[in-house]
Amino acid sequence: MNTRRELPDSPYLAAARGRKPARVPVWFMRQAGRSLPEYRALRARNTMMQACFDADLITEITLQPVRRHGVDAAILFSDIVVPLRASGIALDIVPDVGPVIDHPVRTAADVAAIRPLERQTVEPVEQAVRMLTAALGDVPLIGFAGAPFTLASYLVEGGPSKHHEHTKAMMLGAPDTWHALMSALTDVTIAFLQAQVDAGVDAIQVFDSWAGTLSLADYRAYVLPHSARVFQALAPAGVPMTHFGVGTAELLGAMSEAIATSGAPGVVGVDWRTSLTDAAGRVERGSALQGNLDPVVLLAGWPVVERAVRAVVEDGRRAVDAGAAGHVFNLGHGVLPATDPEIVTATVELVHSL
């Protein structure tokens, strides 16, 4: 059942849909996280996986940065590997390491053993979405999932990887096994996002954290068709959809195609290595842009932050003049744990004043 709210005055939704917002909208990837003392207090009593499968904790953690910073959107607190865990894959999130898979997926038999995501396994996530949409007032809620390629990399490597050698070896050397794996993970991603959409999220963002390790040719051949299927499946909901990766300057056009083929409103996330104006010339016409302050800037003191924030806002305006449908201010990746929350709040206030 569609329980989506009407939020006609949301600056975030306006910019994401290509309409002129009343102000430049701003939110931050990883805005709910270790930079916040209230988050650290909750996490001291709960593991990451416990937090990701507890509706009350998901709700509270998601709300924390909205209360503190006054951002223009909340993003559902979760982790990229949550749908994998919900599908029965044995894994854990190890502090200071990241997701660790008990039995890496390396063969066709391993791929065949991946189970579909059963809706009841993510009921706490759906419940949290319903609680959040009731609590957020006029602030939109962004749903969250990892893209099939990034999920595949975690599964094949067994955890985080610098070179993704096992992943690329399967992709290039065993393409039938690779596409079977990507198809299974695309189904898992669709099911996880569909659960969030049905529960009432106002937008979604798909994180392809490791896509930047690929050439454009390999991305088009081995990844794009599967990512496009995710967006095509979610398009009937009509919510804005964002596609984000790190180090993806050469992939921005293809990543925007993944959404554009669905016909739904599309936003492409841009990291700090690429100017927004340059990105506007790379993405499909009609795409909005999101980004792209370097997260490290927030550690450099307020005078540096202020100059950089003003530069990003101006770059966003030039990008819109160059053809981008809109601009959502964000970082080029997640908020770093050492970031002073007061600097984040001041950044929101500054963006809103410009």
Swiss-Prot record:
Q: Which residues form the signal peptide?
A: none
Per UniProt, the keywords (alphabetical) are: Cytoplasm, Decarboxylase, Lyase, Porphyrin biosynthesis
Looking up InterPro entries in the UniProt record yields: UROD/MetE-like_sf, Uroporphyrinogen_deCO2ase_HemE, Uroporphyrinogen_deCOase
**The reaction(s) this protein catalyses:** uroporphyrinogen III + 4 H(+) = coproporphyrinogen III + 4 CO2
Tagged with keyword Lyase: yes
Q: Mainly localized where? A: cytoplasm
Q: Where in the cell is it found?
A: Cytoplasm
Question: In this UniProt entry, which residues are annotated as the site Transition state stabilizer?
Answer: D79
| Pathway assignment | Porphyrin-containing compound metabolism; protoporphyrin-IX biosynthesis; coproporphyrinogen-III from 5-aminolevulinate: step 4/4
Positions with a binding annotation for substrate: R30, Q31, A32, G33, R34, D79, Y154, S209, H333
Give the Enzyme Commission number: 4.1.1.37
GO terms of molecular function: uroporphyrinogen decarboxylase activity
Q: Which Gene Ontology CC terms are recorded? A: cytosol
Uppermost EC category: lyase
Q: Name the Pfam families for this protein.
A: URO-D
Which top-level group of life is the source organism from? Bacteria
Function, please?
Catalyzes the decarboxylation of four acetate groups of uroporphyrinogen-III to yield coproporphyrinogen-III.
Assembly, per entry:
Homodimer.
Specify the protein name: Uroporphyrinogen decarboxylase
Q: Which organism is it from?
A: Mycobacterium sp. (strain KMS)
